Design a protein with these regions (language model features):
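Replication-associated primase and helicase/ATPase modules
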Residues: 1-9
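Class I S-adenosyl-L-methionine
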Residues: 11-184
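A conditional alpha-helix N-cap/helix-loop micro-motif detector
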Residues: 130, 194, 230-234
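Conserved proline-anchored active-site loop of SAM-dependent methyltransferases
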Residues: 134-165, 172-173, 194-227, 239-259, ...
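Conserved Class I SAM-dependent methyltransferase catalytic core
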Residues: 137, 175-177, 227-302
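Short, structured coil segments at secondary-structure junctions
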Residues: 166, 186-188, 274
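Conserved beta-strand segments of alpha/beta enzyme cores
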Residues: 169, 189-193, 277-280
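C-terminal lobe and adjacent flexible extensions of AdoMet/dcAdoMet transferase-like proteins
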Residues: 303-307, 317
Length: 317
């Protein structure tokens, strides 16, 4: 469908950005339309995405009603809907975790690349977790139906949805108001909060003591701080670890330098070592995020919190 006739009819009007709740509603509506493409295995190109967004917002991006970051969020929401609807069946049909990952990769390949970035996404480092990497995080987390899963920097819930299909109870925290609205729509039974995840342990209600935390926090950005804030990752991880239940597991995606032997993070890992053990850490090439608007090298780290009274594990430095 050619969008020009509709766009021409709208160019005389400059549209104000819809209220957050309305934007969330329209993003979910766009995602529902895009879901049909994923269900039938059809790739989503820029033309299809633009038309879908114009239909959902009754306006073009040139009028200011939506930006391309919104469009990419709609695609991501549709992917989450796919996993919520079909993920459990996909897992059942897969003969191995590798085969399940292959299914997820084929689904991910249908989505367009993030070729345009908004000022907010850059400032707040809102670079979404690629769907295949989210599946790997889920495998590392080992979700069970008995778990209470917290995603402190939830975005649209790309990590948490894998806990949901495992039958776990879900708690989601997201600072951005529009994304919180999306989360409430996608995860009807989840507790959704809007705190600064850098101090999640101080802010979240005490009744939530997660057995698993999965997170992809900003690498070097913080609320109310201009420019880079190099302690951002440490603050997010340490606060999440403080909230994690004894014997719980934390799986985190960070910048590549977040490692025990990096001088700037030595004190953070000493603090981690007082209550938990790093059981896995591996660097991830930046090309994994390339389709999502950034090529920064990252790291996947798995941290197991010790049970109350458990001795510190002795490991080689």
């Amino acid at each position: 469908m050619n969008a020009h006739p509709k766009t021409a009819a709208l160019t005389d009007t400059i549209y104000a950005k819809p209220p957050s709740s309305e934007t969330a509603h329209r993003l979910v509506a766009a995602a529902n339309s895009l879901l049909q493409h994923f269900e039938t295995g059809k790739p989503i190109d820029a033309k299809t995405l633009r038309t879908t967004m114009e239909d959902a917002f009754s306006a073009s991006d040139t009028n200011g009603a939506w930006v391309w970051k919104d469009a990419y969020d709609a695609v991501e929401i549709a992917q989450i809907m796919m996993i919520a609807r079909y993920g459990a069946l996909m897992r059942k049909q897969a003969a191995s975790p590798a085969q399940f990952l292959s299914m997820v990769e084929r689904l991910s390949a249908l989505a367009p690349s993030h070729t345009r970035r908004s000022e907010d996404s850059v400032r707040l480092q809102q670079f979404s977790t690629p769907l295949p990497l989210a599946a790997i995080v889920a495998e590392a987390a080992g979700f069970r139906a008995t778990d209470l899963v917290l995603e402190p920097s939830a975005g649209t819930g790309m990590l948490a949805v894998f806990g949901q299909i495992a039958g776990a109870v879900i708690a989601l925290n997201e600072l951005a108001e529009v994304r919180r609205g999306v989360l409430r729509s996608l995860f009807a039974n989840a507790l959704v909060s809007g705190h600064d995840a850098a101090s999640i342990d101080d802010r979240l209600i005490r009744a939530i003591t997660p057995s698993v935390i999965v997170m992809n926090p900003p690498f070097s950005a913080a609320q109310h701080v201009d420019g880079k804030f190099r302690k951002a990752t440490s603050q997010h991880v340490l606060s999440a670890l403080a909230r994690l239940a004894p014997a719980g597991r934390l799986v985190v995606i960070t910048g590549e330098s977040f490692a025990p032997k990096t001088k700037s993070h030595e004190s953070t890992f000493r603090s981690i070592g007082e209550v938990a053990d790093v059981v896995f850490s591996a660097a991830i090439a930046g090309k994994v995020f390339a389709r999502h608007g950034t090529s920064i090298d990252t790291r996947l780290t798995v941290i197991d919190k010790r049970s109350a009274g458990e001795d510190v594990a002795l490991t080689d430095a």
